[in-house]
């Protein structure tokens, strides 16, 4: 029997969302994504501790920030040995509201990869989908540095990223689901509110339809999944980045997976283009309580994990 994972791959590029690169080979993903939380999780495992220790030892006299950048590249280069496509490496979330420093960090990461023998076409620079992050992506894209826009929770963020020419966006399914489920509390009914009605699934479907309708070339990669049903409801999306745990569940399942998203259907949709300038972007984002709260929370969480990683490095020096 064909597995659900193999069926999904007929419609969608499957990406592994992990820093635990030893798990990659069995699922044969095209690309891989990382973030500060995933790297922090990985270096706490015995299998990856030597990478952290070697990076700290090799750059003993350098700043913690310098060492973290080298650690990210160390993980990225190991991941690229196991996949045919691209790896996403994230800019420090504490730069989410600083356009110039985000640009500088993106350039620096690419230089480090190139010094390690990795071409820039195999790397995506992850930036938060703030106004400042989107402006940084606009500059980097013009320089041939491809960007993956993360912490994306709304159509206005997606529209702004497309207008800026970002290579790829990562709308977060699970975190949207979490917010609406918490809001409903005891009234949440998974049978009624999940599946095709899942707010996170609907958000990605809306963004995908908007992009294909207006002919944007920016890739849509659904991210942050809680269940396999969220994944299969988005079969046909350009890419889906999936944790090893959910990849395993899809691998173990033989449930039928049908295409749910189609560019042809999207082109026939009746839609209006979203107006994008700084003031309208900020107002529309502010008007969306879920997107505002989850964006702020995501930046805080990634920043906190960056601090934890810094403390781990300090303890080894």
Curated annotation (Swiss-Prot):
Its EC number is 2.2.1.2. PANTHER family: TRANSALDOLASE. The lineage of its organism: Bacteria, Pseudomonadati, Pseudomonadota, Betaproteobacteria, Burkholderiales. The active site is at residue 126. Homodimer. GO terms for cellular component: cytoplasm. The keyword Cytoplasm applies. Belongs to the transaldolase family. Type 1 subfamily. Transaldolase is important for the balance of metabolites in the pentose-phosphate pathway. HAMAP family: Transaldolase_1. Keywords: Cytoplasm, Pentose shunt, Schiff base, Transferase. The keyword Membrane does not apply. Pathway: Carbohydrate degradation; pentose phosphate pathway; D-glyceraldehyde 3-phosphate and beta-D-fructose 6-phosphate from D-ribose 5-phosphate and D-xylulose 5-phosphate (non-oxidative stage): step 2/3. It comes from the Bacteria. It holds the Pfam family TAL_FSA. PROSITE patterns: TRANSALDOLASE_1 (PS01054), TRANSALDOLASE_2 (PS00958). InterPro entries: Aldolase_TIM (IPR013785), TAL/FSA (IPR001585), Transaldolase_1 (IPR004730), Transaldolase_AS (IPR018225). Its main location: cytoplasm. SUPFAM superfamilies: Aldolase. GO terms for biological process: carbohydrate metabolic process; pentose-phosphate shunt, non-oxidative branch. GO terms for molecular function: transaldolase activity. This is Transaldolase. It is found in: Cytoplasm. It catalyses: D-sedoheptulose 7-phosphate + D-glyceraldehyde 3-phosphate = D-erythrose 4-phosphate + beta-D-fructose 6-phosphate.
């Amino acid at each position: 029997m064909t597995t659900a994972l193999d069926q999904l791959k007929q419609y969608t590029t499957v990406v592994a969302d992990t820093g635990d690169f030893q798990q990659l080979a069995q699922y044969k993903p095209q690309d891989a994504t990382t973030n500060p939380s995933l790297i922090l999780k990985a270096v706490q495992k015995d299998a990856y501790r030597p990478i952290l220790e070697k990076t700290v030892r090799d750059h003993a006299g350098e700043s913690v920030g310098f060492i973290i950048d080298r650690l990210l590249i160390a993980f990225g280069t190991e991941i690229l040995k196991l996949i045919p496509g691209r790896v996403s490496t994230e800019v420090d979330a504490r730069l989410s509201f600083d356009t110039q420093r985000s640009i500088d960090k993106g350039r620096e990461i690419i230089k480090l990869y190139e010094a390690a023998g990795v071409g820039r076409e195999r790397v995506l620079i992850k930036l938060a989908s703030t106004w400042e992050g989107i402006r940084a992506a606009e500059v980097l894209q013009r320089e041939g540095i491809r960007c993956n826009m993360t912490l994306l929770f709304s159509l206005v963020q997606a529209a702004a990223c497309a207008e800026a020419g970002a290579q790829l966006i990562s709308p977060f399914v699970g975190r949207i689901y979490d917010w609406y489920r918490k809001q409903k509390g005891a009234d949440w009914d998974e049978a009624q509110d999940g599946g095709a009605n899942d707010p996170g699934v609907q958000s990605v479907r809306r963004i995908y339809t908007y992009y294909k309708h207006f002919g944007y070339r920016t890739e849509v990669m659904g991210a942050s999944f809680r269940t396999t049903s969220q994944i299969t409801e988005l079969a046909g999306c350009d890419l889906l980045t999936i944790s090893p745990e959910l990849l395993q569940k899809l691998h173990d399942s033989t449930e039928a997976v049908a295409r749910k998203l189609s560019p042809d259907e999207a082109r026939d949709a009746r839609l209006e283009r979203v107006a994008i300038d700084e003031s309208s972007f900020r107002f529309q984002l502010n008007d969306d309580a879920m997107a505002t709260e989850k964006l702020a929370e995501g930046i805080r969480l990634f920043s906190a994990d960056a601090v934890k990683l810094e403390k781990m490095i300090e303890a080894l020096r």
